[in-house]
A protein has these predicted regions:
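SF2 helicase/translocase NTPase motor core
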Residues: 1-26, 30-129
Length: 129
């Protein structure tokens, strides 16, 4: 789908790009995910300012919503992701994949940091909801 952002969406994307610590506080359905993904794409592939992004979200949102949003928008083609959900072996396999974005549910953050055995080497962290 072609992304034709509203002015507020362009403003929000630019705000994220210009501020290393930012919050996008909009009502449901106003495009927080695509705003954030547009900024991530720019930071990963055009500015080369980040190399690895962690998105922390509720289980359903991390498993279903974020992948659907990444796949939905034409301008995000080439954006790679891995869903770090499931059994411990499935989560470890997901972390071994080469991707720009790693999607994880909140309940697994402690495991990721303290028990997974993988370094916490993310350049950017997004906390959803």
């Amino acid at each position: 789908m072609k992304y034709n952002p509203h002015d507020y969406q362009t403003y929000a994307t630019n705000f994220v790009l210009e501020h290393p610590v930012a919050a996008v506080l909009l009502e449901m359905g106003l495009g927080k995910s695509v705003i954030t993904l547009t900024a991530i794409f720019e930071l990963l592939y055009n500015r080369f300012e980040v190399g690895k992004v962690l998105v922390i979200a509720p289980l359903r949102v991390a498993r279903d919503t974020w992948p659907a949003e990444i796949e939905k928008w034409d301008h995000l083609k080439g954006l790679t992701y891995s869903v770090v959900i499931g059994t411990e072996s499935e989560r470890k396999e997901a972390l071994r994949k080469s991707a720009g974005i790693y999607l994880i549910n909140r309940e697994n953050v402690d495991w990721l940091i303290n028990k997974s055995g993988f370094p916490f080497d993310f350049d950017m962290v997004v906390i959803d909801e």
